[in-house]
Amino acid sequence: MLRLYVLVMGVSAFTLQPAAHTGAARSCRFRGRHYKREFRLEGEPVALRCPQVPYWLWASVSPRINLTWHKNDSARTVPGEEETRMWAQDGALWLLPALQEDSGTYVCTTRNASYCDKMSIELRVFENTDAFLPFISYPQILTLSTSGVLVCPDLSEFTRDKTDVKIQWYKDSLLLDKDNEKFLSVRGTTHLLVHDVALEDAGYYRCVLTFAHEGQQYNITRSIELRIKKKKEETIPVIISPLKTISASLGSRLTIPCKVFLGTGTPLTTMLWWTANDTHIESAYPGGRVTEGPRQEYSENNENYIEVPLIFDPVTREDLHMDFKCVVHNTLSFQTLRTTVKEASSTFSWGIVLAPLSLAFLVLGGIWMHRRCKHRTGKADGLTVLWPHHQDFQSYPK
Protein backbone atom coordinates (compact mmCIF):
# COMPACT_ATOMS: atom_id res chain seq x y z
CA MET A 1 0.00 0.00 0.00
CA LEU A 2 2.85 2.38 0.80
CA ARG A 3 4.43 1.73 -2.58
CA LEU A 4 1.11 2.34 -4.34
CA TYR A 5 0.68 5.61 -2.42
CA VAL A 6 4.14 6.80 -3.41
CA LEU A 7 3.50 5.98 -7.06
CA VAL A 8 0.14 7.72 -7.07
CA MET A 9 1.66 10.78 -5.43
CA GLY A 10 4.48 10.68 -7.97
CA VAL A 11 2.05 10.65 -10.90
CA SER A 12 -0.03 13.44 -9.39
CA ALA A 13 3.12 15.51 -8.95
CA PHE A 14 3.59 15.54 -12.71
CA THR A 15 0.12 16.99 -13.31
CA LEU A 16 0.19 20.58 -14.53
CA GLN A 17 -0.71 23.10 -11.87
CA PRO A 18 -1.88 26.72 -12.21
CA ALA A 19 0.75 29.21 -13.40
CA ALA A 20 0.67 30.99 -10.03
CA HIS A 21 2.89 28.23 -8.63
CA THR A 22 5.58 28.24 -11.30
CA GLY A 23 8.15 29.67 -8.88
CA ALA A 24 8.29 26.31 -7.09
CA ALA A 25 9.85 24.70 -10.15
CA ARG A 26 12.95 26.87 -9.88
CA SER A 27 14.24 24.94 -6.83
CA CYS A 28 14.73 21.24 -7.57
CA ARG A 29 14.47 18.67 -4.80
CA PHE A 30 17.31 16.13 -4.87
CA ARG A 31 15.98 12.69 -3.94
CA GLY A 32 19.37 11.02 -3.57
CA ARG A 33 21.29 8.38 -5.45
CA HIS A 34 19.56 5.35 -6.90
CA TYR A 35 20.34 2.21 -4.88
CA LYS A 36 21.54 0.30 -7.93
CA ARG A 37 24.84 0.93 -9.70
CA GLU A 38 25.28 0.06 -13.36
CA PHE A 39 28.47 -1.91 -14.08
CA ARG A 40 28.87 -2.41 -17.84
CA LEU A 41 31.45 -3.50 -20.41
CA GLU A 42 33.17 -1.23 -22.87
CA GLY A 43 31.91 -1.48 -26.44
CA GLU A 44 28.42 -2.66 -25.48
CA PRO A 45 25.06 -0.83 -25.44
CA VAL A 46 23.98 0.78 -22.15
CA ALA A 47 20.52 2.12 -21.26
CA LEU A 48 20.21 4.18 -18.07
CA ARG A 49 16.59 4.37 -16.92
CA CYS A 50 15.57 7.59 -15.14
CA PRO A 51 15.01 6.37 -11.54
CA GLN A 52 11.92 8.55 -10.98
CA VAL A 53 10.05 7.32 -14.06
CA PRO A 54 9.59 3.56 -14.53
CA TYR A 55 8.97 2.45 -18.10
CA TRP A 56 5.33 1.56 -17.49
CA LEU A 57 4.70 5.09 -16.12
CA TRP A 58 6.44 6.93 -18.93
CA ALA A 59 3.57 6.90 -21.44
CA SER A 60 1.18 8.62 -19.01
CA VAL A 61 3.53 11.30 -17.66
CA SER A 62 5.72 12.10 -20.68
CA PRO A 63 3.30 14.73 -22.13
CA ARG A 64 3.33 16.64 -18.81
CA ILE A 65 7.02 16.72 -17.88
CA ASN A 66 10.36 17.81 -19.22
CA LEU A 67 13.12 15.24 -18.59
CA THR A 68 16.80 16.15 -18.85
CA TRP A 69 20.11 14.46 -18.07
CA HIS A 70 23.35 15.89 -16.65
CA LYS A 71 26.68 14.24 -15.91
CA ASN A 72 28.84 14.81 -12.81
CA ASP A 73 26.88 17.92 -11.69
CA SER A 74 27.72 19.69 -14.93
CA ALA A 75 25.35 22.40 -16.06
CA ARG A 76 25.59 21.02 -19.59
CA THR A 77 22.88 18.56 -20.51
CA VAL A 78 23.64 15.22 -22.12
CA PRO A 79 23.56 14.19 -24.82
CA GLY A 80 25.06 17.23 -26.50
CA GLU A 81 23.84 18.44 -29.87
CA GLU A 82 26.80 16.90 -31.70
CA GLU A 83 26.81 13.66 -29.68
CA THR A 84 26.14 10.60 -31.86
CA ARG A 85 26.71 7.82 -29.29
CA MET A 86 24.13 9.14 -26.81
CA TRP A 87 20.45 9.86 -27.06
CA ALA A 88 17.46 10.11 -24.71
CA GLN A 89 14.45 7.97 -25.49
CA ASP A 90 11.35 6.97 -23.48
CA GLY A 91 12.80 8.10 -20.15
CA ALA A 92 16.17 6.39 -20.66
CA LEU A 93 19.62 7.63 -21.65
CA TRP A 94 21.21 5.39 -24.28
CA LEU A 95 24.95 5.00 -24.86
CA LEU A 96 25.97 2.94 -27.86
CA PRO A 97 28.61 1.84 -27.64
CA ALA A 98 29.69 2.72 -24.09
CA LEU A 99 33.27 3.80 -23.45
CA GLN A 100 35.29 3.85 -20.23
CA GLU A 101 35.22 7.64 -20.31
CA ASP A 102 31.43 7.46 -19.95
CA SER A 103 31.84 6.35 -16.32
CA GLY A 104 30.43 8.81 -13.82
CA THR A 105 27.32 10.07 -12.06
CA TYR A 106 24.30 10.81 -14.21
CA VAL A 107 21.52 13.02 -12.83
CA CYS A 108 17.98 12.74 -14.17
CA THR A 109 15.81 15.84 -13.67
CA THR A 110 12.03 15.77 -14.08
CA ARG A 111 10.23 19.09 -14.18
CA ASN A 112 6.84 20.60 -14.93
CA ALA A 113 5.23 23.97 -14.21
CA SER A 114 5.00 23.40 -10.46
CA TYR A 115 7.27 20.52 -9.61
CA CYS A 116 10.94 19.60 -10.01
CA ASP A 117 13.04 16.77 -8.64
CA LYS A 118 16.24 15.00 -9.55
CA MET A 119 17.94 11.73 -8.76
CA SER A 120 21.36 10.33 -9.62
CA ILE A 121 22.53 6.95 -10.89
CA GLU A 122 26.10 5.61 -11.05
CA LEU A 123 27.62 4.13 -14.22
CA ARG A 124 30.96 2.31 -14.34
CA VAL A 125 32.26 1.08 -17.69
CA PHE A 126 34.99 -1.60 -17.48
CA GLU A 127 37.39 -3.03 -19.99
CA ASN A 128 36.09 -6.32 -21.38
CA THR A 129 38.58 -8.66 -19.69
CA ASP A 130 38.30 -11.47 -17.13
CA ALA A 131 40.19 -9.34 -14.61
CA PHE A 132 37.02 -7.35 -13.92
CA LEU A 133 34.68 -10.35 -13.51
CA PRO A 134 34.46 -9.98 -9.71
CA PHE A 135 33.27 -6.38 -10.15
CA ILE A 136 30.67 -6.86 -12.89
CA SER A 137 29.26 -10.28 -11.93
CA TYR A 138 25.81 -10.82 -10.44
CA PRO A 139 25.90 -13.38 -7.62
CA GLN A 140 23.24 -16.09 -7.89
CA ILE A 141 22.78 -19.14 -5.65
CA LEU A 142 21.53 -22.65 -6.39
CA THR A 143 21.05 -25.56 -4.00
CA LEU A 144 23.13 -28.72 -4.24
CA SER A 145 21.42 -31.84 -5.68
CA THR A 146 18.39 -29.90 -6.94
CA SER A 147 17.43 -28.31 -10.24
CA GLY A 148 17.53 -24.53 -10.45
CA VAL A 149 17.44 -21.57 -12.82
CA LEU A 150 20.00 -18.89 -13.65
CA VAL A 151 18.58 -15.58 -14.88
CA CYS A 152 20.35 -13.26 -17.31
CA PRO A 153 19.73 -9.95 -15.49
CA ASP A 154 18.98 -6.36 -16.48
CA LEU A 155 17.95 -6.90 -20.09
CA SER A 156 14.44 -5.43 -19.98
CA GLU A 157 15.41 -2.30 -21.94
CA PHE A 158 16.62 -4.52 -24.81
CA THR A 159 14.05 -7.35 -24.73
CA ARG A 160 10.86 -5.34 -24.18
CA ASP A 161 8.07 -6.27 -26.62
CA LYS A 162 10.22 -9.05 -28.11
CA THR A 163 9.10 -12.67 -28.27
CA ASP A 164 12.12 -14.11 -30.07
CA VAL A 165 14.72 -13.54 -27.36
CA LYS A 166 17.81 -15.63 -28.09
CA ILE A 167 20.56 -15.82 -25.52
CA GLN A 168 23.79 -17.76 -25.67
CA TRP A 169 25.17 -19.09 -22.41
CA TYR A 170 28.83 -19.70 -21.58
CA LYS A 171 30.53 -21.30 -18.61
CA ASP A 172 34.17 -20.34 -18.13
CA SER A 173 34.20 -19.04 -21.73
CA LEU A 174 32.91 -22.38 -23.14
CA LEU A 175 29.62 -22.26 -25.07
CA LEU A 176 26.87 -24.45 -23.59
CA ASP A 177 25.45 -26.18 -26.67
CA LYS A 178 21.83 -27.12 -27.21
CA ASP A 179 22.43 -30.86 -26.75
CA ASN A 180 23.82 -30.39 -23.25
CA GLU A 181 21.64 -32.42 -20.88
CA LYS A 182 23.00 -30.61 -17.84
CA PHE A 183 22.15 -27.07 -18.98
CA LEU A 184 19.06 -26.02 -20.92
CA SER A 185 18.51 -22.50 -22.25
CA VAL A 186 14.75 -21.90 -22.05
CA ARG A 187 13.71 -20.61 -25.45
CA GLY A 188 12.20 -17.12 -25.58
CA THR A 189 13.30 -16.31 -22.02
CA THR A 190 16.39 -15.13 -20.17
CA HIS A 191 16.59 -18.37 -18.15
CA LEU A 192 19.13 -21.20 -18.04
CA LEU A 193 17.88 -24.39 -16.39
CA VAL A 194 20.54 -26.33 -14.45
CA HIS A 195 19.75 -30.00 -13.78
CA ASP A 196 21.02 -31.81 -10.67
CA VAL A 197 23.23 -29.03 -9.36
CA ALA A 198 26.72 -30.21 -8.36
CA LEU A 199 29.60 -28.48 -6.58
CA GLU A 200 31.60 -28.32 -9.82
CA ASP A 201 28.83 -26.22 -11.39
CA ALA A 202 29.99 -23.24 -9.34
CA GLY A 203 31.86 -20.54 -11.21
CA TYR A 204 31.37 -17.74 -13.70
CA TYR A 205 28.71 -17.82 -16.42
CA ARG A 206 28.11 -15.34 -19.23
CA CYS A 207 24.87 -14.75 -21.07
CA VAL A 208 25.06 -12.86 -24.35
CA LEU A 209 22.16 -11.16 -26.15
CA THR A 210 22.54 -9.82 -29.69
CA PHE A 211 21.06 -6.35 -30.17
CA ALA A 212 20.62 -4.65 -33.55
CA HIS A 213 20.66 -0.88 -34.03
CA GLU A 214 20.62 0.90 -37.38
CA GLY A 215 21.75 -2.23 -39.15
CA GLN A 216 24.66 -2.95 -36.81
CA GLN A 217 24.86 -5.88 -34.37
CA TYR A 218 26.00 -5.41 -30.78
CA ASN A 219 26.56 -7.93 -27.99
CA ILE A 220 25.08 -7.29 -24.56
CA THR A 221 26.89 -9.37 -21.94
CA ARG A 222 25.96 -10.12 -18.36
CA SER A 223 28.26 -12.11 -16.07
CA ILE A 224 26.94 -14.33 -13.28
CA GLU A 225 28.85 -15.87 -10.40
CA LEU A 226 27.09 -19.10 -9.44
CA ARG A 227 27.47 -20.13 -5.82
CA ILE A 228 26.36 -23.53 -4.57
CA LYS A 229 24.84 -23.99 -1.14
CA LYS A 230 24.36 -27.32 0.54
CA LYS A 231 20.85 -28.60 0.90
CA LYS A 232 19.50 -28.25 4.42
CA GLU A 233 18.48 -31.74 5.48
CA GLU A 234 15.54 -32.37 7.74
CA THR A 235 15.38 -35.02 10.43
CA ILE A 236 12.57 -36.41 12.52
CA PRO A 237 12.43 -34.26 15.68
CA VAL A 238 12.46 -35.90 19.10
CA ILE A 239 10.84 -34.21 22.12
CA ILE A 240 13.08 -34.87 25.13
CA SER A 241 11.29 -32.70 27.71
CA PRO A 242 9.05 -31.88 29.61
CA LEU A 243 8.35 -34.59 32.19
CA LYS A 244 4.92 -36.20 32.36
CA THR A 245 4.07 -34.44 35.64
CA ILE A 246 5.41 -31.17 37.03
CA SER A 247 5.02 -30.30 40.72
CA ALA A 248 4.50 -26.67 41.68
CA SER A 249 3.15 -24.67 44.59
CA LEU A 250 0.09 -22.53 44.03
CA GLY A 251 1.06 -18.89 43.70
CA SER A 252 4.60 -19.65 42.55
CA ARG A 253 6.18 -18.81 39.21
CA LEU A 254 6.82 -21.85 37.01
CA THR A 255 8.69 -22.40 33.73
CA ILE A 256 8.31 -25.67 31.81
CA PRO A 257 10.75 -26.03 28.90
CA CYS A 258 9.82 -27.98 25.79
CA LYS A 259 13.15 -29.15 24.37
CA VAL A 260 13.39 -30.83 20.96
CA PHE A 261 16.37 -32.70 19.55
CA LEU A 262 16.99 -32.24 15.80
CA GLY A 263 20.38 -33.87 15.34
CA THR A 264 21.95 -32.43 12.19
CA GLY A 265 18.58 -31.24 10.89
CA THR A 266 17.80 -27.58 10.31
CA PRO A 267 15.63 -25.71 12.82
CA LEU A 268 14.43 -23.31 10.12
CA THR A 269 11.60 -25.57 8.94
CA THR A 270 10.64 -26.97 12.34
CA MET A 271 7.71 -25.41 14.20
CA LEU A 272 7.32 -25.73 17.96
CA TRP A 273 4.47 -24.55 20.17
CA TRP A 274 2.35 -25.29 23.27
CA THR A 275 -1.36 -26.05 23.67
CA ALA A 276 -3.67 -26.19 26.69
CA ASN A 277 -6.64 -28.55 26.31
CA ASP A 278 -5.85 -28.67 22.56
CA THR A 279 -6.09 -24.86 22.32
CA HIS A 280 -3.30 -22.42 21.58
CA ILE A 281 -1.94 -20.80 24.74
CA GLU A 282 -2.97 -17.30 23.61
CA SER A 283 -6.58 -18.45 23.30
CA ALA A 284 -6.62 -20.61 26.43
CA TYR A 285 -5.18 -17.78 28.56
CA PRO A 286 -6.28 -14.50 26.95
CA GLY A 287 -5.28 -12.59 30.08
CA GLY A 288 -1.63 -13.51 29.58
CA ARG A 289 -1.06 -15.22 32.92
CA VAL A 290 0.34 -18.23 31.08
CA THR A 291 2.46 -17.48 28.00
CA GLU A 292 4.99 -19.02 25.64
CA GLY A 293 8.52 -17.75 26.11
CA PRO A 294 10.86 -16.85 23.24
CA ARG A 295 12.01 -19.64 20.96
CA GLN A 296 15.66 -20.63 21.34
CA GLU A 297 17.82 -22.38 18.75
CA TYR A 298 21.23 -23.69 19.78
CA SER A 299 23.77 -26.47 19.27
CA GLU A 300 25.38 -28.87 21.71
CA ASN A 301 28.22 -31.12 20.49
CA ASN A 302 27.40 -30.17 16.87
CA GLU A 303 23.79 -31.30 17.24
CA ASN A 304 20.86 -28.92 16.97
CA TYR A 305 18.13 -28.23 19.51
CA ILE A 306 15.15 -25.92 19.72
CA GLU A 307 13.30 -24.95 22.87
CA VAL A 308 10.13 -23.04 23.75
CA PRO A 309 9.28 -22.54 27.45
CA LEU A 310 5.79 -22.37 28.93
CA ILE A 311 5.68 -19.70 31.65
CA PHE A 312 3.14 -19.55 34.51
CA ASP A 313 3.05 -16.28 36.42
CA PRO A 314 1.74 -17.46 38.81
CA VAL A 315 0.42 -21.05 39.05
CA THR A 316 -3.27 -21.22 40.04
CA ARG A 317 -5.67 -24.06 40.73
CA GLU A 318 -7.07 -23.68 37.21
CA ASP A 319 -3.79 -24.98 35.80
CA LEU A 320 -4.14 -28.27 37.70
CA HIS A 321 -7.04 -29.23 35.43
CA MET A 322 -5.33 -28.38 32.13
CA ASP A 323 -3.87 -30.87 29.67
CA PHE A 324 -0.71 -29.22 28.32
CA LYS A 325 0.99 -30.45 25.16
CA CYS A 326 4.29 -29.62 23.55
CA VAL A 327 3.79 -29.85 19.76
CA VAL A 328 6.55 -30.09 17.13
CA HIS A 329 6.03 -30.26 13.38
CA ASN A 330 8.15 -30.35 10.23
CA THR A 331 7.79 -31.92 6.80
CA LEU A 332 8.75 -35.36 8.13
CA SER A 333 6.88 -35.64 11.40
CA PHE A 334 4.20 -34.33 13.77
CA GLN A 335 4.67 -35.15 17.45
CA THR A 336 3.23 -34.18 20.81
CA LEU A 337 4.22 -34.75 24.43
CA ARG A 338 1.74 -34.27 27.27
CA THR A 339 2.41 -32.85 30.70
CA THR A 340 0.27 -31.82 33.66
CA VAL A 341 0.86 -29.53 36.62
CA LYS A 342 0.35 -31.07 40.06
CA GLU A 343 0.16 -29.20 43.35
CA ALA A 344 3.31 -29.79 45.35
CA SER A 345 2.86 -31.97 48.46
CA SER A 346 2.62 -30.08 51.78
CA THR A 347 4.76 -32.73 53.59
CA PHE A 348 7.90 -31.10 52.43
CA SER A 349 6.96 -27.72 53.85
CA TRP A 350 6.02 -29.19 57.27
CA GLY A 351 9.34 -30.97 57.33
CA ILE A 352 11.10 -27.67 56.85
CA VAL A 353 9.18 -26.17 59.76
CA LEU A 354 9.73 -29.16 62.10
CA ALA A 355 13.39 -29.60 61.32
CA PRO A 356 14.60 -26.74 63.59
CA LEU A 357 12.29 -27.93 66.40
CA SER A 358 13.63 -31.46 66.13
CA LEU A 359 17.16 -30.13 66.29
CA ALA A 360 16.31 -28.09 69.37
CA PHE A 361 14.84 -31.15 71.12
CA LEU A 362 17.96 -33.15 70.28
CA VAL A 363 20.20 -30.46 71.72
CA LEU A 364 18.14 -30.15 74.91
CA GLY A 365 17.99 -33.92 75.23
CA GLY A 366 21.73 -34.15 74.87
CA ILE A 367 22.30 -31.54 77.56
CA TRP A 368 19.91 -33.36 79.92
CA MET A 369 21.63 -36.71 79.32
CA HIS A 370 25.03 -35.14 79.89
CA ARG A 371 23.97 -33.66 83.23
CA ARG A 372 22.34 -36.92 84.38
CA CYS A 373 25.43 -38.92 83.56
CA LYS A 374 27.60 -36.43 85.41
CA HIS A 375 25.35 -36.66 88.45
CA ARG A 376 25.57 -40.49 88.55
CA THR A 377 29.33 -40.35 88.24
CA GLY A 378 29.52 -38.17 91.35
CA LYS A 379 27.54 -40.77 93.40
CA ALA A 380 29.75 -43.53 92.18
CA ASP A 381 32.87 -41.73 93.45
CA GLY A 382 31.42 -41.57 96.99
CA LEU A 383 30.87 -45.35 97.15
CA THR A 384 34.38 -46.30 96.12
CA VAL A 385 35.77 -44.89 99.38
CA LEU A 386 34.04 -47.70 101.32
CA TRP A 387 34.85 -50.54 98.94
CA PRO A 388 38.43 -51.24 100.19
CA HIS A 389 37.21 -51.92 103.77
CA HIS A 390 34.56 -54.35 102.57
CA GLN A 391 37.01 -56.07 100.27
CA ASP A 392 39.64 -56.53 103.09
CA PHE A 393 36.96 -57.90 105.36
CA GLN A 394 35.75 -60.45 102.86
CA SER A 395 39.08 -61.44 101.26
CA TYR A 396 41.03 -62.60 104.35
CA PRO A 397 39.24 -65.15 106.45
CA LYS A 398 40.25 -65.70 109.96
UniProtKB/Swiss-Prot annotation:
Q: What about PTM?
A: A soluble form (sIL1R2) can also be produced by proteolytic cleavage at the cell surface (shedding) involving a metalloproteinase; hovever, several sIL1R2 forms ranging from 45 and 60 kDa are reported.
Which positions does UniProt annotate with glycan attachment?
Answer: N66, N72, N112, N219, N277
Top-level taxon of origin: Eukaryota
Q: Where are the transmembrane segments?
A: 344-369
Q: Which GO terms describe its biological process?
A: cell surface receptor signaling pathway; immune response; negative regulation of cytokine production involved in inflammatory response; negative regulation of interleukin-1 alpha production; negative regulation of interleukin-1-mediated signaling pathway; negative regulation of protein processing; protein processing
The question of whether Transmembrane helix is a record keyword is answered with yes
Name the UniProt key words of this record, in alphabetical order.
Answer: Cell membrane, Disulfide bond, Glycoprotein, Immunoglobulin domain, Membrane, Receptor, Repeat, Secreted, Signal, Transmembrane, Transmembrane helix
Could you tell me which Pfam families the record lists for this protein? ig
| Function noted in UniProt | Non-signaling receptor for IL1A, IL1B and IL1RN. Reduces IL1B activities. Serves as a decoy receptor by competitive binding to IL1B and preventing its binding to IL1R1. Also modulates cellular response through non-signaling association with IL1RAP after binding to IL1B. IL1R2 (membrane and secreted forms) preferentially binds IL1B and poorly IL1A and IL1RN. The secreted IL1R2 recruits secreted IL1RAP with high affinity; this complex formation may be the dominant mechanism for neutralization of IL1B by secreted/soluble receptors.
Q: What family is this?
A: Belongs to the interleukin-1 receptor family.
Q: How does it associate, per the subunit comment?
A: Associates with IL1RAP to form a non-signaling interleukin-1 receptor complex.
Instruction: Report what the protein is called.
Output: Interleukin-1 receptor type 2
Question: Mind giving the lineage of the organism this protein is from?
Answer: Eukaryota, Metazoa, Chordata, Craniata, Vertebrata
